């Protein structure tokens, strides 16, 4: 009896250029590791891709860039989905898990400037310079350090945002360095913003692959892409965010590092106007990263983080 060939593995992806570059990288790595298997990409648009005329914080962020892919996984239409980990909620739908975290690229935020500001760094931009960002996290931290700058919401994919900058709608943009690097646009990075000024988003720079919890075949395939140090760092970050009941659209930032078996997690919570900014740090063994995230959340809550976040949740309510 001749055995039937293994079924194709279906990978879910958003349709944006960055999402496809990331998904095709995963597809290529799996094809290289498992040359006898077939990996097909299926694309779909998410709510976050479709609604471009409303600030992200006003839409709400529960599955904004992931829900449609998750529905497809639960329906058996795709086997796993590739996400920018920073877009993946810390609480996943029942039946789905974070199956793999890939090696992280530079998680820093980057300053991209219009040509007329090419001789400036972030700290030398003149009063009234218009900075484009859709992130409340970046907004709050930059307002804290540079209250003389002006900030304006910017939506759309990376190419759209850069086109708006080049057309003069903005003087500068704050973007994720990893996204620019993955799209071969590293030359647009004018300055990497130091962690002392802007802590990055939870999971920024890493890819998170979401799959069905009860799918041992897929989980086994994904093991080959897991990068343990990145996973440990991101587990700590995600536990911190989850405990604070924050999403990707609140002013919560992190930074993590591993040295000699010790993981150090720095976290930040800020008010929208940037006037109140809480920042603290914990260190501990890499063997229990989630415990570190929970400990740091408790420390910041004791300093008033919950009150700051409650005010934000009352102010920035998702539109119906």
From Swiss-Prot:
Necessary cofactors: dipyrromethane
EC number of this enzyme: 2.5.1.61
InterPro entries: HemC, Porphobilin_deaminase_cofac_BS, Porphobilin_deaminase_N, Porphobilinogen_deaminase_C, Porphobilinogen_deaminase_C_sf
Biological process per Gene Ontology, one example term: chlorophyll biosynthetic process
GO molecular function, one term: hydroxymethylbilane synthase activity
Assigned GO CC terms: cytoplasm
Catalytic activity, as annotated: 4 porphobilinogen + H2O = hydroxymethylbilane + 4 NH4(+)
Record keywords, A-Z: Chlorophyll biosynthesis, Porphyrin biosynthesis, Transferase
Residues annotated with S-(dipyrrolylmethanemethyl)cysteine modification: 248
Cofactor remark: Binds 1 dipyrromethane group covalently.
Pathway: Porphyrin-containing compound metabolism; protoporphyrin-IX biosynthesis; coproporphyrinogen-III from 5-aminolevulinate: step 2/4; Porphyrin-containing compound metabolism; chlorophyll biosynthesis
Extent of the signal sequence: none
Root EC class: transferase
Note: The porphobilinogen subunits are added to the dipyrromethane group.
Function: Tetrapolymerization of the monopyrrole PBG into the hydroxymethylbilane pre-uroporphyrinogen in several discrete steps.
Subunit-structure text: Monomer.
UniProt-listed PANTHER family: PORPHOBILINOGEN DEAMINASE
UniProt similarity note: Belongs to the HMBS family.
Protein name: Porphobilinogen deaminase
Lineage: Bacteria, Bacillati, Cyanobacteriota, Cyanophyceae, Synechococcales
């Amino acid at each position: 009896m001749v055995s039937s060939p293994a079924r194709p593995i279906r990978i879910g992806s958003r349709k944006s250029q960055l999402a496809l570059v990331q998904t095709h990288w995963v597809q290529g790595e799996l094809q290289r590791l498992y040359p006898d298997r077939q990996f097909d990409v299926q694309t779909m648009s998410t709510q976050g891709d479709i609604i471009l005329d409303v600030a992200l914080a006003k839409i709400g962020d529960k599955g904004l860039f992931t829900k449609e892919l998750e529905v497809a996984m639960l329906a058996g239409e795709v086997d796993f989905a590739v996400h920018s980990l920073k877009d993946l909620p810390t609480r996943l739908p029942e039946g789905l898990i974070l199956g793999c975290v890939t090696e992280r690229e530079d998680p820093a935020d980057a300053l991209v400037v219009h040509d007329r500001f090419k001789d400036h760094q972030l700290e030398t931009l003149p009063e009234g310079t218009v900075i484009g960002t859709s992130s409340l996290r970046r907004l709050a931290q930059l307002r804290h350090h540079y209250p003389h700058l002006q900030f304006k919401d910017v939506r759309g994919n990376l190419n759209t945002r850069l086109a708006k900058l080049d057309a003069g709608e903005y003087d500068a943009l704050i973007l994720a360095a990893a996204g620019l690097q993955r799209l071969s646009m590293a030359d647009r990075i004018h300055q990497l913003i130091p962690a002392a000024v802007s802590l990055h988003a939870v999971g920024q720079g890493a890819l998170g692959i979401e799959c069905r919890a009860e799918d041992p075949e897929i989980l086994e395939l994904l093991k080959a892409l897991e990068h343990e140090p990145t996973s440990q760092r991101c587990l700590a970050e995600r536990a911190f965010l989850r405990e604070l009941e924050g999403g990707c659209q609140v002013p919560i930032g992190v930074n993590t590092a591993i040295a000699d078996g010790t993981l150090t997690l720095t976290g930040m919570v800020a008010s929208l106007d940037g006037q109140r900014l809480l920042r603290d740090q914990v260190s501990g063994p890499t063997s229990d990263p989630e415990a570190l995230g929970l400990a740091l959340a408790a420390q910041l809550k004791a300093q008033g983080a919950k009150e700051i976040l409650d005010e934000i949740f009352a102010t920035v309510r998702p539109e119906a």
